[in-house]
Amino acid sequence: MDVNIAPLRAWDDFFPGSDRFAQPDFRDISKWNNRVVSNLLYYQTNYLVVAAMMISVVGFLSPFNMILGGIVVVLVFTGFVWAAHNKDALRRLKKRYPTTFVMVVMLASYFLISMFGGVMVFVFGITFPLLLMFIHASLRLRNLKNKLENKMEGIGLKRTPMGIVLDALEQQEEGINRLTDYISKVKE
């Protein structure tokens, strides 16, 4: 299946008035996770642009450490995803606690980069954009268009880069399973 790049959303959609932002319900982790995944899919190109701008600024100031940090993060993430597919304990951790899994990847990357002395570049160039994405995705309420786009991605009508990353973290399967359960209930 072809991978489609999601469109760049309008700035007033990405950052509307304060009425479209709300604190997530921390007691209902699955609902919060659903909001984050939905927003990551819907605003993925906006997140990529913001992260690219931040990475470019930090990379301009310290190019070697930025390239080193990027390589380490990609290698550690790939290694953890590979290990999680081959070890059941890691697979369960990744599926049940995706945020913890990403934090472990970031901490492992941090310790590897600290051996080379580029920790501040790592913090501001790589981790800070990820933190901003997570905060925005957690606080931004979804609209109808967002929900529709996510359903299309969930049932396989569209395939995007963020969808591939979320599949690697096993965050898409749950939504597809819920959708198929709903469809089978409707048929009955």
From Swiss-Prot:
GO biological process: negative regulation of L-glutamate import across plasma membrane
Intracellular or extracellular location(s): Endoplasmic reticulum membrane; Cell membrane; Cytoplasm; Cytoplasm, Cytoskeleton
Keywords, alphabetical: Acetylation, Cell membrane, Cytoplasm, Cytoskeleton, Endoplasmic reticulum, Membrane, Transmembrane, Transmembrane helix
Region (Targeting to endoplasmic reticulum membrane): 136-188
Keyword Membrane on entry: yes
Membrane topology qualifier: Multi-pass membrane protein
Residues covered by region (Required for homodimer formation and heterodimer formation with ARL6IP1): 103-117
Segments on the Cytoplasmic face: 1-35, 78-93, 136-188
N-acetylmethionine modified-residue sites: M1
UniProt keyword annotation of Acetylation present: yes
Quaternary data: Homodimer. Heterodimer with ARL6IP1. Forms multimers. Interacts with ARL6. Interacts with prenylated RAB1A and RAB3A. Interacts with SLC1A1/EAAC1. Interacts with RTN2 (via first transmembrane domain). Does not interact with VAMP1, VAMP2 or VAMP3.
Purpose: Regulates intracellular concentrations of taurine and glutamate. Negatively modulates SLC1A1/EAAC1 glutamate transport activity by decreasing its affinity for glutamate in a PKC activity-dependent manner. Plays a role in the retention of SLC1A1/EAAC1 in the endoplasmic reticulum.
Protein family (similarity comment): Belongs to the PRA1 family.
Protein name stated in the entry: PRA1 family protein 3
